[in-house]
Curated annotation (Swiss-Prot):
It is an enzyme of class 1 (oxidoreductase). Its EC number is 1.17.1.9. Its cofactor is [2Fe-2S] cluster; [4Fe-4S] cluster; Mo-bis(molybdopterin guanine dinucleotide). Keywords: 2Fe-2S, 4Fe-4S, Iron, Iron-sulfur, Metal-binding, Molybdenum, NAD, Oxidoreductase, Repeat. The lineage of its organism: Bacteria, Bacillati, Bacillota, Bacilli, Bacillales. It comes from Staphylococcus aureus (strain MRSA252). Residues 257-313 form the 4Fe-4S Mo/W bis-MGD-type domain. One of its GO terms (biological process) is formate metabolic process. This is Putative formate dehydrogenase SAR2393. [4Fe-4S] cluster 1 binds at H95, C99, C102, C109. The keyword Iron applies.
Length: 984
């Protein structure tokens, strides 16, 4: 095979690797070629024709040319320049240049920059207005009269995000971008990911918040704006002066528009991007090709849900309860109240009478200081975080089998896999950017997707095969599939021999897991499971993703273990496109656990009960540490009821809504002697507190987050804290110092340096190595090298071998005669968790105003109810009143309740956890949220739908196609390739 090819570029020879994109190669040599429709994250679209060059004497598009032979390329001769000018003129026929008074004139308009760099002075074809008005969606708008039909938005929607809503209607007299079958944006299947606005090269597709806000002269009335445009064009005889003026105005904007790199504060994908702010106003969020987890992708929350930052419900002063009511006080008074109460409770009841709950929304550095406050200052290990509610069982299963509690590869590996298996994960709504990667791999590259879930969500609809097991029975089919693979000699014997131990004992434990047994337990036909087993064993590479549908069961740890067992038996670790992916739910739930906010583990999962580990931290902290493991979240609540816990300090966590059996939890709060809540808002939980401290959200501080793929990323402060609110790390430091300790951190980087000193998993992490969009995936070695794929040098056990873990199953699902309905629950795309942050963005509240219950058509018919009916759901622990949405996403007596009940407005009204019980996974104390049953009472039989009629779930269908279908443009009678117009 030839290693390099000779490419002669403008008279100079280069050695180039075969398969290189010609346009990318030309750019790499600092040679300018216009390329308006090309985007490095999307590849060639071939609509603009501006990138024409001469290849071996023929004018061709460089963007779609792959270097597969020696070639001679010319970018500067007259024929090339004539072809390029023709293409540029055609663009200006569709797009009016009024840069100085355009909101997009911020230095990154690709039409402006291309025309300027090319040196275009006059356009040949007069601009032609099109017979269309602007179309406004909730978050972005489309201006057909500025659209050049480059098709980037179509490519992004169809083949990057895979929402499959946008296309270009090439058959019109005046082609334009349309949504679905030509409906307004707000009536379409659009999910508002915003990627169309991200990739648009001009002002045709733009964020609503930008319009009238970005420029010095763009906030005028439309008529005045048009007059200014005409005046500007008349005053400037050539584009050179126009560009000079607009460039000066763009430079002025830099003084007031700040662009700050940050990391999304919602789910665990870890999307990074620049946030554009003007004073405190958030204009837009702009991801980058350099964003390591997401590239140019976003979801509706990361792109648009920032209303919480400037919400009028933000806390700006500390609150102290006096005579039963909250009063605003200065910081010193609030800190004194906390210090006095902590001291008196510790003196009276001992340090273990105090407890601390850390936040998965806060930074690594802040989570570290919370556990340090508990352990060093107070002397207790009663510290935990919300991974207890969701991810602890997955971590347990991985610790048992492979030794690290995190994703075994990167998000890229989810794209590379030949087969993806999704179990108990509503990925398209809970981790939408990850789902897009998988949807793309399936659509464009043939990845096979298998989904096991009790509910038919989007990924189930798209799956090559969809299986619906009975609730809580996944362990049965996982183990039966593994047994079948071994029984039929389909297991990876070489991998097992070299890298796995305990095979014989494990195989014996599978004796009862026959396919017949699995069919009886799960309801999945034996033939389907056999076919799956054979496909899984024979696939070149397999990844398994799972989430709360697995972990929030009373056998969550064992089911997670069964997943890893299957991967080991089939040899699906230690290679690209393979491995275990417990998709983390919060932006920093991985990091919060990594960094030691756990009752039995300090940083890097080092045991607090190990003498040598404690000795290391005692030397750093200057105190003796408590050698006894503390209480987890579940045990804290029980400890309050039992009189063992007298104080609770939690931050960034609405425990009174999100914990299971919240009637029991709220009753515990009322028994506390002293409670501190630290948050952006006066949350439902905060209403029980004695002191409420105003905390700053992510845009108001520096720090790091660790995402689901173990990726550590920096976020930078974009705004000053609102009012007297403070970053959490500063609050913890102030409390520690009030309690006579001498914490003196000047910046979160100093906290990370301390973490790195104490934590082998983070040993090489530093802010310098995380500068900008740089990132590291733990374990990070002292020299700064990291491990995007785990276990390449062996598994995380002393002998380097993984361990197969024997399991048993007796967790049969049984329908209760009284509580005859099974209650499933989870996230919606538009909201996050209880919705405290997302409901502060009005258009998200408009899309999904309140919580509701999904009911199957057959259950609705059985109970005589219709869309919008009001029902009371009653379980053994409580009751909730909700409106009904009838949908075939659920079947039979399965119902689904989203987590978001807008608790700050509604309290616990309609909260799912009024129905859940206190049962837990025996190994991790994770509540079995998904193991809930209820009965139903009908209040009204029909009513107004709980969903906005413009919500994409309401009778909206996707319209998939491949790319922009540029061949339809080329087939139009009015199209001629510019290269063919060049007079030879």
């Amino acid at each position: 095979m030839q290693e390099h090819l000779v490419v002669t570029l403008d008279g100079k020879d280069y050695l180039v690797e075969p398969g290189t994109n010609l346009l990318e190669f030309i750019k790499s040599q600092d040679t300018f070629v216009p390329s308006i429709c090309y985007n490095e994250s999307m590849g060639p679209i071939q609509t603009c024709d501006t990138c024409t060059v001469e290849i071996d004497g023929k004018i061709e598009r460089s963007c779609s040319t792959v270097i597969d032979r020696p070639m001679t390329v010319n970018t500067v001769n007259n024929d090339v320049k004539d072809a390029q000018k023709e293409a540029l003129d055609r663009i200006l026929e569709k797009h009016m240049l009024y840069c100085t008074v355009c909101d997009y004139n911020n230095g990154d308009c690709e039409i402006h920059n291309t025309m300027d760099a090319w040196g275009l002075q006059h356009q040949t074809y007069e601009y032609k207005e099109k017979p269309y008005e602007k179309d406004y969606g909730p978050f972005y708008r489309y201006d057909p009269n500025q659209c050049i039909l480059c098709g980037r938005c179509v490519e992004a929607c169809q083949d990057i995000e895979l929402n499959e809503t946008i296309r270009i209607d090439w058959d019109r007299e005046h082609p334009r971008v349309i949504w679905d079958n030509d409906v307004p944006i707000n009536e379409s299947s659009c999910v508002s990911c915003g990627q169309c606005a991200t990739v648009c090269p001009c002002n045709a597709m733009m964020e609503v918040n930008m319009e009238g806000n970005a420029g010095y002269m763009t906030d005028t009335e439309p008529g005045s704006l048009a007059a200014m445009i005409d005046l500007t064009k008349k005053a400037e005889p050539g584009y050179g002066p126009l560009f000079a003026i607009s460039d000066s105005e763009a430079e002025m904007r830099k003084e007031r528009i700040k662009k700050t790199k940050t990391v999304c504060t919602y789910c665990g994908v870890g999307c990074s991007f620049e946030v554009w702010t003007k004073d405190r106003e958030i204009l837009k969020v702009q991801p980058s090709h350099d964003s390591p987890a997401n590239k140019i992708a976003t979801c509706v929350k990361g792109k648009f849900s920032w209303g919480h930052i400037n919400s009028d419900q933000r806390l700006t002063k500390p609150l102290v309860r006096k005579n039963g009511e909250f009063h605003e006080v200065e910081w010193d008074e609030a800190l004194n109240v906390i210090a006095d109460n902590f001291t008196s409770i510790k003196e009276k009841h001992g340090p273990d009478a105090l407890s601390f709950i850390s936040s998965s929304k806060a930074t690594n550095e802040e989570s570290y200081l919370m556990q340090k406050l508990a352990r060093q200052v107070i002397g207790t290990n009663n510290v935990d975080n919300c991974s207890r509610y969701c991810q602890a069982p997955a971590t347990k299963g991985l610790f048992r089998t492979v030794g690290h509690g995190g994703d075994s590869g990167s998000i890229e590996d989810l794209e590379k896999a030949a087969m993806s298996v999704l179990i108990g994960t509503n990925t398209a709504e809970a981790h939408p950017v990850i789902a897009s990667r998988m949807k793309r791999a399936q659509k464009l590259f043939g990845q096979k997707i298998h989904v096991f879930d009790i509910r038919k969500h989007e990924m189930a609809e798209r799956a090559d095969r969809f299986y619906q097991p009975k609730p809580g029975t996944d362990l049965a089919w996982l183990s039966a599939v593994t047994k079948y693979i071994i029984d039929h000699d389909l297991h990876d014997k070489a991998f097992i021999e070299e890298w796995v131990e305990d095979f014989d004992e494990y195989y014996k434990s599978l004796e009862t897991f026959t396919m017949a047994f699995a069919e009886e337990a799960t309801g999945i036909p034996e033939a389907e499971l056999i076919k799956f087993a054979e496909e899984c064993a024979k696939a070149e590479s397999v990844v398994i993703c799972w989430a709360m549908g697995i972990t929030q069961q009373d056998i969550g740890s064992d089911s997670s273990t069964a997943i890893s067992n299957l991967l080991l038996v089939t040899g699906n670790y230690r290679r690209p496109g393979t491995g275990a992916y417990p998709l983390r739910g919060h932006n920093n739930v991985q990091g919060c656990s990594d960094i030691g906010s756990m009752p039995d583990k300090i940083t890097g999962y080092q045991s607090i009960e190990a003498d040598d580990i404690r000795a290391k931290f005692e030397k750093e902290y200057g105190v003796k540490l408590n050698p006894k493991a503390g209480k987890d979240n579940h045990e804290m609540v029980e400890g309050i009821h039992d009189g063992q816990i007298h104080s609770l300090y939690l931050y960034g966590e609405d425990t009174g809504i999100v914990d299971s059996n919240i009637n029991f939890v709220q009753a515990a709060f009322e028994k506390l002697d002293f409670m501190v809540v630290q948050d952006e808002f006066l949350t439902f939980t905060a209403t029980y507190a004695d002191v409420v401290l105003p905390a700053s959200p992510s845009l108001e501080k520096d720090g790091t987050f660790t995402n689901t793929e173990r990726r550590i990323q920096r976020l930078y402060q974009a705004l000053k804290p609102l009012g007297d609110s403070k970053p959490d790390w500063k609050i913890f430091q102030a409390i520690a110092n009030k309690l006579s300790f001498d914490w003196n951190y000047k910046h979160p980087s100093e906290i990370m340096d301390e973490i790195a000193r104490l934590t082998p998993l983070y040993a090489g992490v530093s802010y310098e190595r995380l500068e900008g969009f740089n990132s590291l995936q733990w374990p990070v070695h002292p020299d700064g090298t990291d491990e995007p794929i785990l276990y390449l040098e062996g598994f995380n056990f002393d002998n380097g071998k993984a361990k197969l873990f024997p399991l048993s199953f007796d967790n049969y699902f049984k329908q209760d005669e009284v509580y005859d309905i099974h209650v499933n629950n989870g996230r919606l795309l538009e909201h996050f968790h209880e919705g405290n942050m997302t409901y502060q963005t009005p258009m998200l509240k408009y899309k999904v105003p309140r919580a509701f219950v999904e009911i199957s058509p057959e259950l609705a018919e059985d109970r005589g109810i219709h869309e919008g009916a009001e029902v009371k759901l009653i379980s053994e622990t409580g009751e909730a009143v909700l409106q009904v949405h009838v949908t075939d996403r659920v079947k039979g007596k399965e119902i689904y309740i989203p987590l978001n009940n807008d608790a700050m407005e509604n309290g616990d009204l309609g909260a799912i956890n009024l129905l859940t019980n206190s049962d837990v996974d025996q190994y991790t104390d994770t509540p079995s949220y998904k193991r809930t049953s209820c009965r139903m009472e009908v209040i009204t039989k029909r009513g107004k739908s709980p969903l906005n009629p413009n919500n994409f779930r309401v009778n909206k269908k996707r319209h998939p196609q491949y790319s922009v279908q540029v061949q339809k443009k080329w087939e139009r009678p009015d199209y001629v390739f510019p290269g063919n117009q060049v007079d030879k």
